[in-house]
Amino acid sequence: MILHQHFPSLVPIMKRYPYAIQRADLIRYVLLYLYGGVYLDLDYVCLRNLAPLLDSLPPGCAVGLVPSNNSQGHVTNSVLVSHPRAEFWLYVIRATMQNKPWWAVTKHLLVFSTTGPFMLNRVLSDYPYPFKIHIFPNAVVPCNTCNLTRCKATGSESFLLPVVGKSWHSWDSTMFDWMYCHSTLLLVAMVFFMLCAMTHKSK
């Protein structure tokens, strides 16, 4: 009903999405634009009142984003803070209308590139008014996917503790998580096999 009233052009796009998580992503951006507030995924435990996150946005900043502890230099779309009618979300909503990239051949890549973090970071890098976006410190969500069961959020700046969720993830999500958490091992293995190949070729 909200889409029909405020963004009717999004209705056919939402219907074409193959996965429910894509529709959930789009709706969160629309609601943040219309009403503002604090959005977070269900797989978080609140450690304290979240109102200070919204109150701490610097003057002139309408949107607050949280760094992804899984990807250096990127933000996550699982925790979003905004005042109502922040223009940034219109850029994000428009980006969800674009065609999927050619390389988005698995569910994880498709979701991330069309409505998820890849798309959000692409919009953020192209946004012409970066001074209107506040990036919170990593300590707001101090854990990553590799240490969920061991992480202890004890810092004074920690607001949220992620827990194991991943309700929409599929086999490729599990694979990418494993590769990320074992990147050092993979790098060592690649170097080892390259050296073996070079040694074999020189004989």
Regions found by a protein language model. Give the residues of each.
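Small-residue hinge/turn detector
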Residues: 25-37
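Glycosyltransferase-associated regions of secretory-pathway enzymes
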Residues: 1-24, 40-203
